[in-house]
Swiss-Prot record:
Pfam families: TsaD. Keywords: Acyltransferase, Cytoplasm, Iron, Metal-binding, Transferase, tRNA processing. This is tRNA N6-adenosine threonylcarbamoyltransferase. One of its GO terms (biological process) is tRNA threonylcarbamoyladenosine modification. Its EC number is 2.3.1.234. GO terms for molecular function: iron ion binding; N(6)-L-threonylcarbamoyladenine synthase activity. The gene is tsaD. It comes from Pelagibacter ubique (strain HTCC1062). It comes from the Bacteria. Required for the formation of a threonylcarbamoyl group on adenosine at position 37 (t(6)A37) in tRNAs that read codons beginning with adenine. Is involved in the transfer of the threonylcarbamoyl moiety of threonylcarbamoyl-AMP (TC-AMP) to the N6 group of A37, together with TsaE and TsaB. TsaD likely plays a direct catalytic role in this reaction.
Amino acid sequence: MNKKPIILGIESSCDETAASIITENEQGMPTILSSIVSSQVDVHKEFGGVVPELAARSHMEKIDLITKKAFDKSGVKMEDLDAIAATAGPGLMVCLSVGLSFGKAMASSLNKPFIAVNHLEGHALSPKLNSELNYPYLLLLISGGHTQFLSVQGLGNYKRLGTTIDDAVGEAFDKTAKLLGIEFPGGPQIEVYAKKGDPNKYELPKPIFHKGGCNLSFAGLKTAVLKISKQIKTEQEKYDLAASFQKTIEEILYKKSKIAFEEFKKMNTINKNKFVVAGGVAANKRIREVLTNLCKEEEFEAIFPPINLCGDNAAMIAMVGLEKFKLKQFSELDSPAKPRWPLDADAAFLKGAGVRL
């Protein structure tokens, strides 16, 4: 019987310190043996956002303990590992360096292969941890730092169909939460507030809604929320603004996803089209519901990671490591951290005030 590979994943790109050990079952499906995530909410709460230097210090203080917990829960010994995978980017440079250095040191001391992982590729492959997923598929990556549509042709082969030209959708959620006085991290609480509000109370803008293909924009929406928030006097008005904001995001993602479906079908001729939605914002239940309904209308299969694997975690990093290990795609121990590391390196850089669509 062939030994199944055992991979350790390390994640420290922003404000979660995470370690995970995964393997495969007899059917070749990934199996999570352990997944430990330590959040830094209490560290950054008083500042209303992530402070890079404090985040890096917290990573350095916790990474040993978090990794030990991953080993303890999995029952795996260090010498049983087949490879160590660590996030190398994109993310905050000072934070990336902690996990990357830790992973390299482990690989060197154990004489095991090291695999530098693109954090975004981790999100892209995260649904493979709980479902069979073959290439190609359409990916909507929605998080605090990224919002983009990609045709996933294979491991390491991504074709960007559309992206935000300014802010990420997760950032818009976080900014709206802050304006409503919701304690950090407030983005996920918008959905809770929205349930108590009238989604038709405020008419909010949907930038580049009728142009730009499946590119997106959220800066104008954020500005509108800022203006309205200054006039709010009651809790109910906060709920109404949250509900109106949530509804606007749903409408934008519905419309732009529908356009992306057509672009994807032009590139790929397959029997069953699949639509993967991943990243922290994919945990939003209303967005899941709206995009699932769209998939039913357009005959796409909707695929989401489990809620606990939508945010940053190391299981998805180990998942990429597992795929790369099987292809013997190893990295050098001097692999650098990459604060910016697009999945589609050939795609034009769209972000910036000079973009005209």
